[in-house]
């Protein structure tokens, strides 16, 4: 949201560019931080096709731009690339246990494909890529109705309700 960065507007070293990464963009950059995908299940399931296109077609466009400009790319990925893991905790070399056709697959598989594209661009074209797999983000502007575990816990606690833990409580 624009109000989250309002304090940066007008700074000489900051420029806000509103652009859908599914469409190529032509500009000069030296770093790209890709966080362009909804992470809340209701948000990414609302338009599943748009979600997977953002992760895949968007990543092709980002990597093409990075290759042309020799820019570094940081991808905000997700713990969802592990799916419903059989190993706890997961290490980076764990490939995951993912349902490729389930209702969440637009997000999970989109992020997995984006990581694949990044590594292929790195190996084939020397693009400098970094991937961070983020688990359970939270912060002062998070929506309490976004359907993720931290927001659900906070909402239940504020209402004085017990916290709902699904499964055995060993999930990471």
Regions found by a protein language model. Name each.
Residues 140-147, 169-172:
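Substrate-binding strand-loop-helix patch
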Residues 152-158:
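Activation segment of eukaryotic-like protein kinases
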Residues 1-137, 157, 167-168:
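N-terminal Rossmann-like NAD(P)+-binding domain of SDR-like oxidoreductases, especially those catalyzing
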Residues 164:
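Nucleotide-binding/hydrolysis machinery
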Residues 88-89, 144-152:
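A glycine/serine/threonine-rich, flexible loop-to-helix segment
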């Amino acid at each position: 949201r624009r109000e989250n960065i309002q304090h940066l507007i007008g700074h000489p070293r900051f420029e806000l560019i509103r652009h859908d990464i599914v469409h190529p963009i032509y500009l000069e950059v030296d770093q790209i931080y890709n966080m362009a995908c909804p992470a809340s299940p209701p948000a990414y399931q609302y338009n599943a096709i748009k979600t997977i296109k953002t992760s895949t077609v968007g990543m092709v466009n980002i990597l093409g731009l990075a290759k042309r400009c020799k820019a570094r790319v940081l991808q905000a990925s997700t713990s969802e690339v592990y799916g419903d893991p059989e190993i706890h905790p997961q290490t980076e070399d764990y490939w995951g246990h993912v349902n490729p056709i389930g209702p969440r697959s637009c997000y999970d598989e989109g992020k997995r494909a984006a990581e694949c594209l990044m590594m292929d661009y790195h190996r084939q074209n020397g693009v400098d890529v970094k991937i961070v797999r983020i688990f359970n983000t939270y912060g002062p502007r998070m929506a309490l109705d976004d359907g993720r575990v931290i927001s659900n816990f906070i909402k239940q606690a504020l209402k004085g309700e017990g916290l709902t833990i699904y499964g055995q409580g060993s999930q990471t």
